[in-house]
């Protein structure tokens, strides 16, 4: 079932790819080589007693390969806990980054998504 017009999809997909593939994007940890991943991050404050709390829900909705979409993967984490001892290995060759105080989708759900695609991508045979 097609949910959006093909012309709209053709306009949006390159933007979703840039979110993952460029240094200005917020989802570089999902830039798994050979799978042309695109996606959109989302970080939301959870409501509590009519106000917003400091608790987060982080989401990353991804599609791959963006040039000929076959799969979508949505990862949502409820109250993810950043780990100051965790070592993030960038996929673009930059030096690893140790520790994280950022509780945003770009540092939590995107990383999980990248790990999942890295493992299931070869099984799905979706390399472009």
Which residue stretches match the model-derived regions?
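Conserved catalytic neighborhood of penicillin-recognizing serine enzymes
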Residues: 1-7
């Amino acid at each position: 079932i097609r949910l959006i017009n093909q012309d709209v999809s053709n306009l949006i997909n390159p933007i979703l790819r840039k979110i993952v593939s460029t240094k200005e994007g917020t989802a570089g940890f999902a830039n798994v080589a050979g799978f042309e991943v695109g996606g959109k991050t989302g970080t939301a404050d959870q409501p509590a007693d009519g106000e917003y709390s400091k608790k987060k829900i982080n989401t990353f909705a991804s599609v791959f390969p963006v040039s000929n979409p076959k799969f979508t993967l949505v990862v949502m984490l409820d109250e993810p806990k950043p780990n100051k001892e965790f070592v993030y290995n960038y996929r673009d060759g930059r030096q690893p980054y140790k520790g994280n105080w950022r509780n945003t989708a770009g540092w939590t759900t995107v990383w999980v998504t990248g790990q999942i695609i890295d493992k299931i991508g070869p099984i799905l045979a979706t390399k472009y």
